[in-house]
């Protein structure tokens, strides 16, 4: 199984691009906020229980998806301070041990555009960060740095590339569709 690991700051367009990539590839989408929202119904964000269960669920889904012979899975991820050190290496090992491979895709976007996107209605569907002052504070504190991230196979600036074009670039870079 190919795990397409899309990461970037909040509001960089991870879910929107991932949805476009699903339309191209037919791969399943594992949106990070599904797990986050589940756990927020019981635990406070960042609590030890939240952090441990979030990682356990992520890794379990990756392993089972590989073992189930899915051709591919698209995962959205926002590096941040509550992700345990070593998660990326544990994820890589879990996927490899189950016979899968991981491709990292980074979405970047200038801060003014990220702040503009914070209040969009699409961010309200999940319990996503929508407060610009809180985003600024967290960014200033380095909260969106989760340590080691492997070099991305592709980095896309979503302020100058539409979600559909971004998904097409990803699909082409990963040889998921023929290059015309």
Model-flagged regions — what are they?
Residues 3:
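Walker A (P-loop) ATP-phosphate-binding motif of ABC ATPase nucleotide-binding domains
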Residues 6:
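Hydrophobic anchor at the beta1->P-loop junction of P-loop NTPases
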Residues 9:
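P-loop (Walker A) phosphate-binding loop of NTP-binding proteins
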Residues 13:
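Conserved glycine(s) of the Walker
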Residues 16-66:
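Conserved substrate/cofactor phosphate-moiety recognition/catalytic segment
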Residues 53-106:
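Glycine-rich phosphate-binding loop used to anchor ATP phosphates in small-molecule kinases
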Residues 98-119, 156:
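Conserved phosphate-donor/acceptor-positioning beta-strand/loop module used by diverse small-molecule
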Residues 120-169, 180:
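Small-molecule kinase domains that catalyze NTP-dependent phosphoryl transfer to phosphate-bearing small molecules
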């Amino acid at each position: 199984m190919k795990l397409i690991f899309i990461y970037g700051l909040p509001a960089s367009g991870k879910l929107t691009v991932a949805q476009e990539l699903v339309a191209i590839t037919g791969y399943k989408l594992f949106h990070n906020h599904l797990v986050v929202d589940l756990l927020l119904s019981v635990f406070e964000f960042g609590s030890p229980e939240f952090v441990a269960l979030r990682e356990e669920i992520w890794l379990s889904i990756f392993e089972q998806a590989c073992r189930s012979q899915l051709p591919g899975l698209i995962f959205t991820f926002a590096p941040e301070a509550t992700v345990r050190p070593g998660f990326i290496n544990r994820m890589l090992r879990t996927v490899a041990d189950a016979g899968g491979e991981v491709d990292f895709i980074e979405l970047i976007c200038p801060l003014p555009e990220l702040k503009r996107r914070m209040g969009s209605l699409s961010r309200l569907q999940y319990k996503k960060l929508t407060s610009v002052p809180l985003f600024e504070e967290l960014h200033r504190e380095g909260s969106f740095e989760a340590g080691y991230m492997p070099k991305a196979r592709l980095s896309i600036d979503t302020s100058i590339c539409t979600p559909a074009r971004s998904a097409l670039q990803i699909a082409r870079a990963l040889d998921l569709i023929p290059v015309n």
